[in-house]
From Swiss-Prot:
Homotetramer; dimer of dimers. It catalyses: L-aspartate 4-semialdehyde + pyruvate = (2S,4S)-4-hydroxy-2,3,4,5-tetrahydrodipicolinate + H2O + H(+). GO terms for biological process: diaminopimelate biosynthetic process; lysine biosynthetic process via diaminopimelate. GO terms for molecular function: 4-hydroxy-tetrahydrodipicolinate synthase activity. Pfam families: DHDPS. This is 4-hydroxy-tetrahydrodipicolinate synthase. The keyword Membrane does not apply. Pyruvate binds at T48, I206. The gene is dapA. SUPFAM superfamilies: Aldolase (SSF51569). Its main location: cytoplasm. Keywords: Amino-acid biosynthesis, Cytoplasm, Diaminopimelate biosynthesis, Lyase, Lysine biosynthesis, Schiff base.
Length: 295
């Protein structure tokens, strides 16, 4: 089977801010960091990119700027999810001719639709564009679980090409592959189980850890996809503390602080209601960076 466009280590990119406003010069530097490190793709304005506290205009501008800075060297996946189908369609249409390689759309959050509601939500979005669509299932945040059976139904829609599964439940992977087909792209949304998912046939991971360990994550995924699991595991174990401790507080709070400590961004700040990493949690994240050999 040919290597899919969406594979390997795909960073769920932070959105750098200075005094509460998006810092586009730093965004350009982050994109360059990932291009040079060998990152296989960038998700722009997903959960880690603070999508919920950016306006639609800001969402679109950040994504378009990310495409501009990447200049065709790395595929950009636009975060276009919403818990209102109409808004998700608007955002998707605004980006249809922007140069993005595809869209990542989170399961509608808070309003807790049924499986049929989720199916119709994604069907409507997919029918509004020719862009490839990646489903995003993260029940811990949305309050709703997109079941494998529903994913299988959605896989019949031509431009729904894959899923980001952030449940961490590896038993779902073979079932999703069975229901959706072997060509349906499975991307782990859980760094701690990302390598294990690739051992089971997953194609990669949409990673938070990648923000601060881009070269290591790219190498780990390349080794795993080549079947060199022992070598990949050695890297994975060195990063395991980061995989866990970057979630010591709600993402992206810890990873922005970690990126700040490494000098990748000039401020660790986020937009309210998210706040900077608490002082009590900072030693834990610092220790994880040290274990990973990044400091």
């Amino acid at each position: 089977m040919a290597t899919p466009l969406f594979h390997g280590s795909i960073v769920a990119l932070v959105t750098p801010m200075t005094h509460g406003e998006v810092n586009y010069e730093e965004l350009k530097k982050l994109v360059e960091y990932h291009v040079q490190a060998g990152t296989h793709g960038i998700v722009s304005v997903g959960t880690t990119g603070e999508s919920t506290t950016l306006s639609i205009d800001e969402n679109v501008k950040v994504i378009k700027k990310t495409v501009e800075f990447a200049d065709g060297r790395i595929p950009i996946i636009a975060g276009t999810g919403s818990n209102a189908t109409s808004e998700a369609i608007i955002l998707t249409k605004l980006l249809t001719n922007s140069g993005v390689a595809g869209c990542l759309s989170v399961v509608p959050y808070y309003n807790k639709p049924t499986q049929e509601g989720m199916y119709l939500h994604y069907k409507a979005i997919a029918e509004s564009t020719d862009l490839p669509q990646i489903l995003y299932n993260v029940p811990s945040r949305t309050g709703s679980d997109l079941k494998p059976e529903t994913i299988g139904r959605l896989a019949e829609i031509p431009n729904i090409v894959g899923v980001k599964e952030a449940t961490g439940d590896l038993t779902r992977l073979p079932l999703i592959k069975k229901l959706a087909g072997e060509d349906f792209i499975f991307l782990s949304g859980d760094d701690a189980t990302g390598l294990e998912s690739m051992k089971l046939g997953g194609q990669g991971v949409i990673s938070v850890t990648n923000n601060v360990a881009a070269a290591d994550m790219a190498k780990m995924c390349e080794l795993a996809l080549a079947g060199k699991f022992d070598e990949a595991e050695a890297i994975n174990q060195r990063l395991m503390a980061l995989h866990h401790d970057l979630f010591i507080e709600a993402n992206p709070i810890p990873v922005k602080w970690a990126a700040y400590k490494l000098g990748l961004i000039s401020e660790p700040n986020l937009r309210l209601p998210l706040t900077t990493l608490s002082e009590s949690a900072q030693p834990t994240v610092l220790a994880a960076l040290q274990k990973a050999g990044l400091i």
